[in-house]
Amino acid sequence: MAFKDTFNKMISYFDTDEVNEVEEDVTASTDNVIPRSQQSVRASSHPKQEPRNNHVQQDHQARSQEQTRSQMHPKHGTSERYYQQSQPKEGHEMVDRRKRMSTSGIANRREQYQQSTCSDQTTIALKYPRKYEDAQEIVDLLIVNECVLIDFQFMLDAQARRCLDFIDGASKVLYGSLQKVGSSMYLLAPSNVSVNIEEMTIPHTTQDIGFDFDMKRR
């Protein structure tokens, strides 16, 4: 019995070694098979995905290129239409501006010329006083810078002398000048008018002897 047991143990020992070797061979073969199958699956999946990705990238690049071209080079039709529409408007606006500037410039020149002529013009008023109250009207003309040519032929000697004294005093106050230009005529000028009278001999007749007032005192 003891010998039989030892024989069975030896048989079982060798049997387990064979089983282990078989199991190791099976596991190694399975390990080698699984990576090959995974590699085949991966290799088969990559060729399918790469064309799709390339196609998407090409579409995206084509769209981006079209957008950049459209931004850099706009359509000729729209630009020409805009130029044709904007060109007449700009031309009309320039013409209107030039007309306005020319008319305004002419108006300003006219106003300046009128103002200069009005300021440069000197009016000479001819007065024939008949009474003493007319002297105030003559002085009022001197205040507004007008020259007055006074003829006393219609006044008496006493009235003409009083009137002449009043006008002479007013001319001094207003910085004017009073000069005799005839036997019975005197020129009253404002300060901005200079009068140059040449000396001349005035003939004295019986009609105007009384009007040669005390002007020689001046």
Curated annotation (Swiss-Prot):
<keyword id="KW-0131">Cell cycle</keyword>
<dbReference type="InterPro" id="IPR038594">
    <property type="entry name" value="SepF-like_sf"/>
</dbReference>
<feature type="compositionally biased region" description="Basic and acidic residues">
    <location>
        <begin position="47"/>
        <end position="63"/>
    </location>
</feature>
<feature type="compositionally biased region" description="Polar residues">
    <location>
        <begin position="28"/>
        <end position="43"/>
    </location>
</feature>
<dbReference type="InterPro" id="IPR023052">
    <property type="entry name" value="Cell_div_SepF"/>
</dbReference>
<dbReference type="InterPro" id="IPR007561">
    <property type="entry name" value="Cell_div_SepF/SepF-rel"/>
</dbReference>
<comment type="subunit">
    <text>Homodimer. Interacts with FtsZ.</text>
</comment>
<dbReference type="GO" id="GO:0005737">
    <property type="term" value="C:cytoplasm"/>
</dbReference>
<dbReference type="GO" id="GO:0000917">
    <property type="term" value="P:division septum assembly"/>
</dbReference>
<dbReference type="GO" id="GO:0043093">
    <property type="term" value="P:FtsZ-dependent cytokinesis"/>
</dbReference>
<comment type="function">
    <text>Cell division protein that is part of the divisome complex and is recruited early to the Z-ring. Probably stimulates Z-ring formation, perhaps through the cross-linking of FtsZ protofilaments. Its function overlaps with FtsA.</text>
</comment>
<keyword id="KW-0717">Septation</keyword>
<keyword id="KW-0132">Cell division</keyword>
<feature type="region of interest" description="Disordered">
    <location>
        <begin position="24"/>
        <end position="115"/>
    </location>
</feature>
<keyword id="KW-0963">Cytoplasm</keyword>
<dbReference type="Pfam" id="PF04472">
    <property type="entry name" value="SepF"/>
</dbReference>
<protein>
    <recommendedName>
        <fullName>Cell division protein SepF</fullName>
    </recommendedName>
</protein>
<comment type="similarity">
    <text>Belongs to the SepF family.</text>
</comment>
